[in-house]
Amino acid sequence: MSLSSERKVQVIKEHQCSVNDTGSPEVQVALLSERITQLSGHFKQHTHDHHSRQGLLRAVGQRRKLLDYLKKKDLDRYRTLINKLGLRR
């Protein structure tokens, strides 16, 4: 369950801070959010896929860590990101 290359490039372009930015917390959180959304849809049909569910929980935890880091370092960027992605916090 990975993102297609085209979708990944599109998400990176939407959230990057500069031209070659692929590793900023904003980009990483956006990619994880996209993957979490995709996996959540997968579980509507495949309710007993426990191995993928572990991957989902790992991705949610990683996103939480990145959001906590961003909140600690730059509160304005954090608030902008959660509003842009529509996350509850």
From Swiss-Prot:
Any GO BP annotation: translation
A GO term from the CC aspect: cytosolic small ribosomal subunit
SUPFAM superfamilies attached to this UniProt entry: S15/NS1 RNA-binding domain (SSF47060)
InterPro entries for this protein: Ribosomal_uS15, Ribosomal_uS15_bac-type, uS15_NS1_RNA-bd_sf
Superkingdom per UniProt: Bacteria
Transmembrane annotation, as ranges: none
Keyword terms of this UniProt record: Ribonucleoprotein, Ribosomal protein, RNA-binding, rRNA-binding
Pfam families listed in its UniProt record: Ribosomal_S15
Coiled-coil region(s): none
Gene Ontology molecular functions: rRNA binding; structural constituent of ribosome
Subunit and partners: Part of the 30S ribosomal subunit. Forms a bridge to the 50S subunit in the 70S ribosome, contacting the 23S rRNA.
Job of this protein: One of the primary rRNA binding proteins, it binds directly to 16S rRNA where it helps nucleate assembly of the platform of the 30S subunit by binding and bridging several RNA helices of the 16S rRNA.
Family note: Belongs to the universal ribosomal protein uS15 family.
Protein name from the UniProt record: Small ribosomal subunit protein uS15
Lineage, opening ranks: Bacteria, Pseudomonadati, Pseudomonadota, Gammaproteobacteria, Chromatiales
